[in-house]
From Swiss-Prot:
Assembly and oligomerization: Heterotrimer of A, B and C subunits.
PANTHER family in UniProt: GLUTAMYL-TRNA GLN AMIDOTRANSFERASE SUBUNIT B MITOCHONDRIAL AND PROKARYOTIC PET112-RELATED (PTHR11659), GLUTAMYL-TRNA(GLN) AMIDOTRANSFERASE SUBUNIT B, MITOCHONDRIAL (PTHR11659:SF0)
Catalysed reactions, semicolon-separated: L-glutamyl-tRNA(Gln) + L-glutamine + ATP + H2O = L-glutaminyl-tRNA(Gln) + L-glutamate + ADP + phosphate + H(+); L-aspartyl-tRNA(Asn) + L-glutamine + ATP + H2O = L-asparaginyl-tRNA(Asn) + L-glutamate + ADP + phosphate + 2 H(+)
This protein's UniProt keywords: ATP-binding, Ligase, Nucleotide-binding, Protein biosynthesis
One MF term in the entry's GO annotations: ATP binding
Database matches in NCBIfam families: gatB (TIGR00133), PRK05477.1-1 (NF004011), PRK05477.1-2 (NF004012), PRK05477.1-4 (NF004014)
GO biological process, one term: glutaminyl-tRNAGln biosynthesis via transamidation
UniProt-recorded name of the protein: Aspartyl/glutamyl-tRNA(Asn/Gln) amidotransferase subunit B
SUPFAM superfamilies, sorted: GatB/YqeY motif, Glutamine synthetase/guanido kinase
The protein's Enzyme Commission number: 6.3.5.-
Role this protein plays: Allows the formation of correctly charged Asn-tRNA(Asn) or Gln-tRNA(Gln) through the transamidation of misacylated Asp-tRNA(Asn) or Glu-tRNA(Gln) in organisms which lack either or both of asparaginyl-tRNA or glutaminyl-tRNA synthetases. The reaction takes place in the presence of glutamine and ATP through an activated phospho-Asp-tRNA(Asn) or phospho-Glu-tRNA(Gln).
């Protein structure tokens, strides 16, 4: 029997606001435990939340970036559950009236494009974090109340590969808005997956299983592949799939059952009584739309049409906002667009991958990369010498100063080169004769002698011109 897979994804994106969604506590990554908290975060009796307008604005911007319809009238709901990292015993979220609905993103897998629908988007508060050490458990509420957008896809995803492509497209568009850095390693993007399988041609979905808080695209792919295979084996053996929440195990690349999946009734949703309904008007939505930054597709078209890049180069440069911004700054600083693109896609990307860092974590600046490229273009340094200069600018060194201090500047002045060429010719009369007799190797030999004498610093283009002229005059 052949099966088809159906996947839905719930993505939680942490917003880059200065304060939390319902309290004035600051939001920053890496603070001391419980440093960024107040009585609202701790759930003290009698304290009241108030909505952060910036969170609503960012939610609307995310909706516009994902082609979603903004809800004009909405309210918040309480999702009731008890857990140590949730001192109020409920989460303020949106159940009945999400901030946006019916969006989409386009993906491409194996050369085929496909639109993946977005069912709805919610703004809500995050929970705290539990840490277990030995026989002790600790609760850190720094994350409690951090604003989130939950983005719920439609069940349009048919394979783990499509799931990863969807997540990449989602992360890219959210990142370009600037409302979140969507760094999975810091928890600002977390993924819950839902997967089921059914016989090909069936119009009924199979029983789904959920996996929560997966923190890398590779793990998402592995987990979905494992679950799809597990579902099929259970059904082929005549068994039944249990609707449950499972955990991805990095060591085994498999999944482990955690608990029976809860339904919405278990959470006893009801409207949040401490917050009034929220209404947004068309004027504010249009104001936010006018402030939308250029999206990846728009940048790609501009790079191709205005800067002469290939479609492939434009696609690679717009994979992340930091790379695209760096590229544009380097071009503004005078770097040739195609050469800047080549360095970023090759030398810079290779360095980032080897060091396991992001571009923002390095000392490399757009001005220094552009400056190095200009030194190559004007003949100050050779392409070979540029490899050493590149190491210098990775360390934050100014390219011209680094080249001069390390003896990497080419000899291009004819007044300096001509005496060297004359001396080489005086010592190689036979090579002069060979050249005049049509032996081209002689010219290459003489070039080699000149480069050896200058320790590779002579400008090859200038040397070629001067040597040719000198040979013709002898």
């Amino acid at each position: 029997m052949n099966f088809e897979t159906t996947i839905g994804l719930e993505v939680h994106v942490e917003l880059k606001t200065n304060s939390k969604i319902f309290s004035p506590s600051p939001v920053n990554f890496g603070a001391a435990p419980n440093a960024n908290t107040n009585v609202i975060d701790w759930g003290y009796p009698g304290v009241l939340p108030s909505i952060n307008k910036g969170v609503v604005r960012d939610g609307i911007m995310a909706a516009l970036a994902l082609h979603a319809e903004v809800t004009k009238k909405m309210h918040f709901d309480r999702k009731n559950y008890f857990y140590p990292d949730n001192p109020k015993a409920y989460q303020i979220t949106q159940s009945e009236t999400p901030i946006a609905h019916d969006g989409w993103v386009e993906i491409e897998v194996d050369g085929k494009k496909k639109k993946i629908g977005i069912k709805e988007m919610h703004i809500e508060e995050d929970a705290g974090k539990n840490t277990h050490t030995g026989s002790y458990s600790y609760v850190d509420l720094n994350r409690q109340g951090t604003p989130l957008i939950e983005i719920v896809s439609k069940a349009d995803i048919a394979s783990p590969e499509e799931a990863v492509a969807y997540l990449e497209a989602l992360r890219q568009r959210i990142q370009f808005t600037g409302i979140s850095d969507v760094k999975m390693e810091e928890g600002s993007m977390r993924v819950d997956t839902n997967i089921s399988v059914r016989p090909y041609g069936s119009d009924q979905y199979g029983t789904k299983t959920e996996m929560k808080n997966i923190n890398s695209f590779n793990f998402v792919k592995n987990a979905l592949n494992f679950e799809a295979d597990r579902h099929q084996k259970v059904l082929m053996a005549g068994g039944e799939i249990v609707q449950e929440t499972r955990r991805y195990d990095e060591a085994t690349k498999g999944t482990v059952a955690m608990r029976t999946k809860e339904g919405s009734d278990d959470y006893r949703y009801f409207p949040e009584p401490d917050l009034p309904p929220l209404e947004v008007d068309d004027a504010w939505i249009e104001e936010i739309r006018s402030q939308m930054p250029e999206m990846p597709g728009e940048r790609r078209r501009r790079y191709v049409n205005d800067l002469g890049l290939t479609d492939y180069d434009a696609m690679v440069l717009t994979q992340t906002k930091e790379m695209a911004d760096f590229f544009e700054e380097a071009v503004k600083d005078g770097g040739d667009a195609k050469k800047v693109a080549n360095y970023l896609m090759n030398d810079v990307n290779s360095y980032l991958n080897n060091q396991h860092v992001d571009l923002d974590d390095t000392k490399l600046t757009p001005a220094n990369l552009a400056g190095m490229i200009k030194l190559i273009d004007d003949g100050t340094i050779s392409s070979k010498m540029a490899k050493k200069v590149f190491q210098g600018i990775l360390d934050g060194q100014e390219p011209a100063a680094f080249a001069k201090a390390n003896g990497l500047v080419q000899l291009s002045d004819p007044a300096e080169l001509q005496p060297i060429i004359d001396a080489i010719l005086d010592d190689n009369e036979q090579s002069i004769e060979d050249f005049k007799n049509g032996k081209d190797r002689a010219f290459g030999f003489l070039i080699g002698q000149i480069m050896k004498k200058t320790q590779g610093k002579a400008n090859p283009k200038v040397v070629n011109q001067l040597l040719g002229k000198s040979l013709n005059e002898r």
